[in-house]
Amino acid sequence: MRRYLINTVVAVAAMIILSKAAKRELIVKNNICMAGAASALAVGSFIFDKYTMVLWSVLVMQSYTDITEQHLYLMLPRLLAVMEVAYCLVHRTYLDIPLSVMIFPAVLIAAAMLIRAYTIGDMELLLIIMLHTYNQGISPNEYMVSYLSVTGMVFAVYMIVKNVIGMIKHLVPVWKGAFAPAMTVTYFVMFLWKYLS
């Protein structure tokens, strides 16, 4: 019961942040995306634990701004990164899994950013997901490789659908798009996969 209460508070806080920012015109208001964010936060509040719910809220908020503005705000991910490192130190998760298992995924993410596969905001979200999986007792090596692979496929499907809709509306095809929603969908799918298996 307490978990659901904390998760609901986190979800409501995330929606208040989004709606206040949209009301003050700090971010673009999009009713469809706002409804999608509210739905994602509501579903997340029932299935995630309280630590994962904080990450989920940040992913949903970043997805909203990435779709509506093609921009990621870095304050929340950086704050979450500090929280993940503090969690690692306080709960001593580094004793369960050696820190060296984070070298390969970090190098993989940095290399992908250098070849401009990701923006700096996407890279920070990926690093937070890597830290979170490490703190949950999951080795980031295998998880991040499969996560990046599935995210790439989800993003490709998203871009195909976006361009097909654009062709129907007689718009010019686009080659860049919002990557944070693909990361959010992939995180949800991989969580369900792990939860159901």
Predicted features and spans:
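A membrane-topology feature that recognizes alpha-helical transmembrane segments
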Residues: 1-197
